[in-house]
Amino acid sequence: MPRQFDLEHTRNIGIMAHIDAGKTTTTERILFYTGRVHKIGETHEGSATMDWMEQEQERGITITSAATTAQWKGNRINIIDTPGHVDFTVEVERSLRVLDGSVTVFCAKGGVEPQSETVWRQADKYGVPRMAYVNKMDIMGADFYNVIAMMKDRLQCNAVPIQLPIGSEDCFVGMVDLVTMTSHIFKDDLGQVIEDQPIPDDMIEISNKYREQLLEAVAEQDEELMMKYLEGEEFTLEEIKAGIRKATIAVKMIPVTCGSSYKNKGVQQMLDAVIDFMPSPTDIPAIKGISVDGDTEIERPADDNGPFAALAFKIMTDPYVGKLCFFRVYSGTLNSGSYVLNSTKNKRERIGRILQMHANHREEIQVVHSGDIAAAVGLKDTTTGDTLCEENNPVILESMEFPEPVIEVAIEPKTKAGQEKMGVALQKLAEEDPTFRVHTDAETGQTIIGGMGELHLDIIVDRMLREFKVEANVGNPQVSYKETIRKAVKSEMKYARQSGGKGQYGHCVIELEPREPGAGYEFVNKITGGAIPKEYIAPIDAGIQEAMNTGVLAGYNVVDIKVTLIDGSYHEVDSSEMAFKIAGSMAFKDGCRKANPVLLEPIMKVDVSVPEEYMGDVMGGLNARRGRIEGMEARGGAQNIRAVVPLSEMFGYATALRSSTQGRGTFSMQTSHFEEVPKSIQEKVISSRTTGV
């Protein structure tokens, strides 16, 4: 089947912003104007097409990235609407990885808000070309020029307006187009009747000033245009458009448009700018990958005739078709029913059906081409970040890295019958979301779930109830401590039982000594002359390892110990494997008590990014949490602080950081190593563990 839109007329864009800047409302208007929806949905009414999960409609926020496709003036635009809440940054991260460009929505009143900075840094990481749309020009306190200043200051970017608003708040009636130097005035509520007029007299001076800035920004990217500019020659309309496009794709300039999505003003002009200035799949560099053996770098340019290569960027469980895998095609074509290679896992997969997604509606298609974003049904082993490619031309595309969970809680089903259902539900949810982890605590036997924040885990528990009908109790966050010893000791233990008939007899002498942190457990057998028969050596080792699961201080796992078996004795009749296993366990416990046992706690590597004015408060806060500052650096208009802090002190840090930086600070953390717990805190941990208080 021939492609409907060639690559030059295809755009893959994301819509990103701070929570409540109006992303989803903007996407709804795009769908309305491009003819995908015949009635506009509103987020505050819970009827937005893109917010299709029940929790999204209730909370009025976007949680998952909904993908949809639209058509505008003979072009196809694939749009991904991403969440603005910090707990769901993984959705933004994986969307950016497969997009060619993005529209960042700013609130005309709030300007550059904290999540805007986070999202901007993520887009910088992937080198994504961007344009900005200043939304909510109709609300009280709207200030377009302040937003431009904040973008330059906080995001360190070259923000260049290509439109200026005519009026603001209640008087926002249209905009000046700085490319054509005309004005667009909106004459109806739906924003479909637009009159082109000369620039109003009171705006001629400011329009000329910003037009000059635009021409200068365009000239800087092109030597020929710079010569023309310096000689005072006029640019043609085509030269200006080509110059803006070139600078935008090179991420040297951020074109800025304005409007009010809720009042239906400015969205069509923003769509025109997407077509004019955002890259097509052929404008971006060829995607790089490596050969399966990892030796050779391979490039895959956007070309329908090239070998098929795609990246799976999202897994979703759909109530009707089961597991859906969203993927972006970088080169080649793919037919439904065909086989592909998952080169990341070296598994052959069959593409059952291919679906073009429109928020939560779907349309079955037979073939996808390079540059397309679609969803496949029938992939069994594919997860987020996997490469799908032609079996004869394998390639592994650069995958995505996801942050480690920063919060963990214990969870249990409310009923015994829910145990199995909960296991299935958690497995499916973990497949969908790479930042959500599940494991069983060996000490307590509890199921522990980890995620990016409390809202993240709230939504997971909520989805378990709605989608899988599992009710669960959720505990408070816990730290998993470890135990070890600080000095070498010798321990001897004899286990003897006589109760008529065959008795039990096991006797061993062991030496315990501490090992380097992270070195683990080592068992050495130094028995000579048959003091203990060979068949009883392994049971002694097994008994010791079993005893290591519950330490002598507070019942935590024991780590980093070397045990040497040096002597012992046995009884011809009464000795057994069980007797020696018990003797080994008892000797180990006895030795630990004498070997100066200590508690170890997990230490986290913490990265905090804050505006400079909050540095003192934040560093003081980290010190108060027993943190050690390891370094600082300026990064993208913010200060980045690196520290190591005990995990037990990090609970509640997200809230503390938010309040001490007015919501502008962000942090991430991952486990670094284990360290000895200070004596005063060790006593508290032991008493709370033994008394349960």
Swiss-Prot record:
A GO biological-process term: ribosome disassembly
Record: residues binding GTP: 17-24, 81-85, 135-138
Key word GTP-binding present: yes
Subcellular localization, as worded in the UniProt entry: Cytoplasm
Entry's Gene Ontology cellular component terms: cytoplasm
Annotated GO MF terms: GTP binding; GTPase activity; translation elongation factor activity
UniProt keyword terms in alphabetical order: Cytoplasm, Elongation factor, GTP-binding, Nucleotide-binding, Protein biosynthesis
Principal location listed in the UniProt entry: cytoplasm
One Pfam family of this chain: EFG_C
Domain annotation tr-type G: ranges: 8-282
Function summary: Catalyzes the GTP-dependent ribosomal translocation step during translation elongation. During this step, the ribosome changes from the pre-translocational (PRE) to the post-translocational (POST) state as the newly formed A-site-bound peptidyl-tRNA and P-site-bound deacylated tRNA move to the P and E sites, respectively. Catalyzes the coordinated movement of the two tRNA molecules, the mRNA and conformational changes in the ribosome.
Similarity field: Belongs to the TRAFAC class translation factor GTPase superfamily. Classic translation factor GTPase family. EF-G/EF-2 subfamily.
Protein name: Elongation factor G
Native organism: Ruminiclostridium cellulolyticum (strain ATCC 35319 / DSM 5812 / JCM 6584 / H10)
Gene label: fusA
